[in-house]
Amino acid sequence: MKQDDSQIIDYLIRGNEQSNLNKPLSYSYIANPDQTIRWIYPSKLKTPTFLNFYNSSSLRAKIFTVTIKILFALKLSNLIKSNKVYLPIHEGSLLQRILDKYPDYNHSIFTGTVGKNRKIIVELNNGYKSLVFAKVAISNTSKDLIQNEFHVLSKLKHENLTSIYVPEVLAYNEKDLLEISNIKPKRCKQPSKLIDVQIVALTQINSINHKYVQWKDMQAKFEIESLIENLKVKV
């Protein structure tokens, strides 16, 4: 396990010096080509809900996704090229607080893309379907991104949007954590290119901050008319 990954995991599972240690739990993880951790999940996980983090729009990604699902369905997940690690989760640690809030849920973890925007996402599921995503900031930049996401979702919640489903904000603190609901249907397809419904959704979002005014009321009316007249003269 690389040092960056160890630091990320420690950030999740470490408590203070006085906190008690739980019995180490067995986790499996799937690595990227550079051997950094991509997903980490309890070894007893029965459904590969961590695939909700994965963009499966390309043919190669679709094949990978289907293969993983088949192996889990046949209880052959041990054939997946993964590694195991035992993690002692501290009482009071960030991960333990999240799990305590959803005691009946299973979970998996996406460790984020390396860089200043990196954040951790803890996925919580009922054994079959992802229900909650807890986003954890690990830098000032990712903290700002999570804060911005909270404000955007809060604003969209009060808009009359007919083509968009907006995740519900379940919890938020300004320090490092945003919890949102999963709105992705159990059965859905990810298109490889922009489609009509996405264009309509983007148009609705774009219209939120637009304000329509009559031409006669525009402050720049006379400046624009003057520029047009100058163009006519030059022509």
How would you name each of these model-derived features?
Residues 2-110:
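Juxta-kinase regulatory segment immediately upstream of eukaryotic protein kinase catalytic domains
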Residues 93-105, 210-235:
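An alpha-helical support segment within catalytic cores of ATP-dependent transferases
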Residues 112-114:
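Protein kinase glycine-rich loop
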Residues 118-148:
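ATP-binding glycine-rich loop module of kinase domains
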Residues 149-166, 184-227:
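Conserved kinase catalytic-core helix
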Residues 167-176:
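Short beta-strand micro-motifs within the conserved protein kinase catalytic domain, predominantly
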Residues 175-186:
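Conserved short submotifs of the Hanks-type protein kinase catalytic core
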